[in-house]
């Protein structure tokens, strides 16, 4: 589904057998490389450079595929091959750090900018190599150049610390976020009563620029007309997608209060996570059915929604609650407890898949499986327990 899709498809047809048989890639890896702008060139570059990158530079085929699976994958691979020795030998980076920088969109430009600016950022501005790498891996070329330009000003004139500037820059859109902080921090502090730390917290996420501008625009209305506090507005804005979450609160808070009897505190709790907008919209849509048809309380629905991935968790509860209760013997409270963590959807789906095997084949009780699932990282914990019981590791 790209302008160069014809060339990519023809190249997959031509190179897939060789990449799989001679180079050990899977068909899925070949497709991943091809499914970006410039997929044809990326596949040809993988075929050309994979042996050398693995043999001479110690990369794994998986790392080569990860670097190639972006727009501009060809350029990223060629630049990494060219700069890896210099960045490691002359600039003190680890091979993994170079690979990580290359494995993001704009990897070529980010690597070239690290080579150019790392000495100055470390020697003249006091940043560490790890900080430069963090900026390059997220904000890329533009963020590194913005840090070079604005670091002294933001620290000297605005009172920020170097760590705060790095935190703002180390996100997608870091350049724009730094410029927004330079422009809006005095206004947000003087006119709206925010602290520097609050402004930094809002800016230190993907989309920080938009979130800061939206806070400036909506803070008076959200506080005066909707009864929120400044701290609540900041909490909503201080996540990926903060702009969208604030606008969703502005739009849905009156409806959720009037039609669904939610409190402002509950609405804020739902909105104050990555994906807050989607979670609020899903609560509005699914709360009546979850309460009337599935017997949940509004408080339980809010608890499920008030995590990263709340939208997906609510939709999965709607789909799996009847099955998990009727066929697997879980109580509603147990399903809610499992769903009420970040990644609730994945945990519920993994529980549905592994619960019968863990109980019947490995002798765990229902309560033991539920206890494993009812924490952050529940999906990974269930899969690790299953793997260990299926093929015991003597070291454990």
What name fits each language-model region?
Residues 1-3, 396:
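Accessible peptide chain termini
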Residues 3-380:
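Thr-biased low-complexity repeat/linker tracts and other Thr-enriched repetitive architectures
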Residues 373-378, 382-395:
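Leucine-rich solenoid repeat scaffolds
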């Amino acid at each position: 589904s790209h302008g160069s899709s014809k060339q990519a498809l023809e190249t997959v047809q031509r190179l897939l057998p060789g990449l799989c048989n001679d180079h050990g890639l899977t068909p899925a890896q070949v497709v991943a490389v091809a499914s970006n702008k410039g997929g044809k060139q990326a596949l040809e570059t993988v075929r050309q450079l994979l042996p050398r990158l693995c043999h001479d530079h110690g990369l794994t085929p998986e790392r080569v595929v990860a670097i190639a699976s972006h727009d501009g994958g060809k350029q990223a691979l060629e630049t990494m091959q060219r700069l890896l020795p210099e960045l490691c030998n002359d600039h003190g980076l680890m091979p993994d750090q170079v690979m990580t920088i290359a494995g993001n969109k704009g990897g070529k430009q980010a690597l070239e900018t690290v080579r150019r600016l790392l000495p100055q950022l470390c020697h003249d501005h006091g940043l560490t190599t790890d900080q430069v790498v963090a900026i390059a891996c997220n904000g890329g070329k533009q963020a590194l150049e913005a840090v070079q330009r604005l670091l002294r000003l933001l620290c000297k004139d605005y009172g920020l610390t170097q760590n705060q500037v790095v935190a703002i820059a180390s996100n997608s859109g870091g350049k724009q976020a730094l410029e927004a902080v330079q422009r809006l921090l005095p206004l947000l502090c003087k006119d709206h009563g925010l602290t520097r730390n609050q402004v930094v917290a809002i800016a230190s996420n993907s989309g920080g620029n938009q979130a800061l501008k939206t806070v400036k625009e909506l803070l008076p209305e959200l506080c005066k007309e909707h009864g929120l506090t400044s701290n609540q507005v900041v909490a909503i804005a201080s996540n990926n997608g903060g702009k969208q979450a604030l606008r969703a609160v502005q739009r849905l808070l009156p409806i959720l209060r009037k039609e669904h009897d939610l409190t402002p505190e509950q609405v804020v709790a739902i909105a104050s996570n990555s994906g807050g907008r989607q979670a609020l919209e899903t609560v509005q849509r699914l709360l009546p059915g979850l309460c009337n048809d599935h017997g949940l309380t509004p408080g339980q629905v809010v608890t499920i929604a008030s995590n990263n991935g709340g939208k997906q968790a609510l939709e999965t509860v709607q789909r799996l609650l009847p099955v998990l209760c009727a066929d697997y013997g879980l109580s509603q409270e147990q399903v809610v407890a499992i769903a009420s963590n970040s990644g609730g959807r994945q945990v519920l789906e993994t529980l549905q898949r592994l619960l019968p095997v863990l109980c019947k084949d490995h002798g765990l009780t229902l309560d033991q499986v539920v206890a494993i699932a009812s924490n952050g990282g529940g999906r990974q914990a269930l899969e690790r327990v299953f793997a260990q019981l299926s093929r015991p590791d003597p070291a454990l």
